[in-house]
Curated annotation (Swiss-Prot):
Gene: ribA
Catalytic activity: GTP + 4 H2O = 2,5-diamino-6-hydroxy-4-(5-phosphoribosylamino)-pyrimidine + formate + 2 phosphate + 3 H(+)
Protein name: GTP cyclohydrolase-2
Keywords: GTP-binding, Hydrolase, Metal-binding, Nucleotide-binding, Riboflavin biosynthesis, Zinc
Record: active site: D121, R123
Source organism per UniProt: Campylobacter hominis (strain ATCC BAA-381 / DSM 21671 / CCUG 45161 / LMG 19568 / NCTC 13146 / CH001A)
Length: 193
């Protein structure tokens, strides 16, 4: 793994003042959004890119809601959002749009990925281990509903899982049920939203 690291820059946002640093891994450029001060265990959100949700506000998923809730939490409590360039559970934007087309025809998110020849989830988290080691972080509170992220980290202690509570909408209810029932996502708290 060949990794280049950018300088740190200030980033004012509608969620508050952050610092940002980019990590270039081969052809992918990941972003770390930092709110200081932070202390161990460090509040960490690992967020995979979702152009349709994060930038356009798609209601088919809960990605933008999770990102925004995480930024609010980090702004208030300190920590980092590690924004990974792994669009569509790492199948890429082109294939994700083809998966959306299959979902429009009745397949769920997993069936669509399989129909296109992909695994349920193609993401990897080695770069996260590298980033946490770079910042000398040994213990984290992981903001996630995805148990795979808990298992995907190898060089850090996960002290706690912090659920991200999102209210479902009529467009993403099936998607969220599939994530819960088939991928093991921990979404029971969403019913309280």
């Amino acid at each position: 793994m060949n990794i280049e690291i950018s300088n740190v820059a200030k980033l004012p946002s509608r969620f508050g003042m952050f610092k940002v640093q980019a990590f270039k891994e081969d052809e992918k450029e990941h972003l770390v959004i930092i709110k200081e001060p932070y202390k161990e265990p460090v509040n960490i959100r690992i967020h995979s890119e979702c152009l349709t949700g994060d930038a356009i506000g798609s209601l088919k998923c809960d990605c933008r809601d999770q990102l925004e809730e995480s930024l609010k939490f980090i702004e208030k409590n300190g920590g980092m959002v590690i924004y990974l360039r792994q669009e569509g559970r790492n199948i890429g934007l082109f294939n994700k749009i083809n998966a959306y087309n299959l979902q429009d025809k009745g397949l769920d998110t997993i069936e669509a990925n399989h129909q296109l020849g992909f695994k349920t989830d193609e993401r990897t988290y080695e770069i996260v281990d590298f980033i946490l080691k770079y910042y000398k972080i040994k213990s984290i509170n992981l903001l996630t509903n995805n148990p795979k992220k808990l298992m995907g980290l190898h060089n850090v202690k996960v002290a706690a899982r912090v659920p991200i509570i999102i209210k479902p909408n009529k467009f993403n209810e099936k998607y969220l049920q599939t994530k819960k029932n088939e991928m093991g996502h921990l979404l029971d708290d969403n019913k309280k939203a």
